[in-house]
Structure formats: structure tokens, C-alpha cells
Amino acid sequence: MKALRRSTCLRRPLAIIAVVVVAIIVVAGVFGFRAYSDAQYNNAVAACATASENVRNATNDYNNLVNGDASEAAALIKKDVKDASTLDALNKELSVELPVYEGCVADDTAGFKSATAKLNEQADWYKAYTQSLQKAVDAVNASKK
């Protein structure tokens, strides 16, 4: 009977220790996951803000060209240039439909990542069309009489 009581007394503290260790591991896992999730969210928000700034800069470059050199070149008429097709190409470049700015409006990490991807596409669009518009402006200016 003493042996039975002794083994029961030894098992009970071991069981309590095991439960406490498991509880500590679970709590640490939950806090670790939350910290990881928060870090991912913060990184996504920061990336979206950077992408938004890139779109703003690319849009400004495009608008400066449209309102500056492209506007002056578009004011020319066919009599003012040697090759009238350069004016047609310029007008075609000026009539493109601009992308709609969506911004960083999201509630979760996936939403911010999606918004970042869209903003990066918009920045690329503005950069590409700024270059093609500049080429069209240069062609009109080279064709001036």
C-alpha cells in the first residue's frame, strides 16, 4: 500500500509540471504568431505607402510633361511641322485613359499586399507612358519647320 501511495504522489507533480509546460508553450506560440502577424501587417502597410509615393512621383512626372512640353507641341498645327503624322501620334498619346488611383485602402495584410501590387502596376504604367509621350513630343519638335 505504501508503494502505491508513493507512485501516486510522484505522478501527480509530474502531471502538473507537464500541464504547466504545455500551457507555457501554447501561450508562447500564440504570442509568437501574433508578433509575426503584426510584423507582416506593418511591412505590408509600409510597402503600400512606398508604392503610393512612387505612383505620386510618377504621376507628377507624367502630368508635368503633359502640361508642359506636350501641351506646347500639341498646340502646333499641321502647317507647323514637316511630318503631320507626328502630331497624330502625339494626340494619340495624349488621349490615353489614365489609371484610376486606388490608394492604400485595406483592412488586412492581404488587402495591403493587393493594393501594393496595383499601385506598382500604376507606377509602371505612368513611367512607360511618360517615356512614350516624351518620344512623341521629341518627334514633333524634331519635325518643326
Region locations from a protein language model:
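Amphipathic alpha-helical assembly segments used for oligomerization, scaffolding, or translocation
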Residues: 1-145
